[in-house]
Amino acid sequence: IYLIQMGLDSEQSFTIMESVRKGKGLKEEWKEEMRAHDVPEWYIDSCLKIKYMFPKAHAAAYVMMAWRIAYCKVYYPLAYYAAYFSIRATGFNYEIMCQGRERLTYFQKDYERRKDSLSKKEQDVYRDMKIVQEMYARGFDFTPIDIYRAKPDRFQIIDGKLMPALNTIDGMGDNAAIAVAEAAKDGKFLSRDDFRQRTKATKTVIDLMGDLGLLGDMPESNQLS
């Protein structure tokens, strides 16, 4: 900005200061141009001595990172983990990660044994396992998914615990999760058949939800025996 104020071309001013910032100094033609615009010698000498300057944009980015990762992680931990899992976690798996720390540790050790041969999806799961382990280590826990309260793709803080999003159920994609959340707004599901018809969820996903205890005592069909 100073060089622009002194009358140098804006593009040339940027090029000069990028060179100075990286410790590459000044070309002779730049020095001549600066002197032609009455840039003082002390300024030119300073540009020749600078080895590195931290850009403002980088400084701002580090401050924002410190706010998110340091301050929020320490003082608003559940909000931090809810945001992280909702936005950053691409391999979060409800069955593996939300059934207690012991179960997670079992799967994590298995992944570690196969670390060099993990698929891309498994690598994402393994990365998210570490964050979940950190959360458990800090004394926080998950609450089971409530199909009437859970969001399609957002974790929630419920009674001091995290409720995972519907799309963390293995096999339930984003569209299916949205369909479940929308169908739940229309009232209680009378049976698994009713759930299947209203949400279009696959039998595999419904069976998994049943095994995980997410469907409660929901009967198989509406028919009375």
Model-derived regions: residue spans:
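Noncatalytic, beta-rich nucleic-acid-contacting surfaces in large DNA/RNA-processing enzymes
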Residues: 1-225
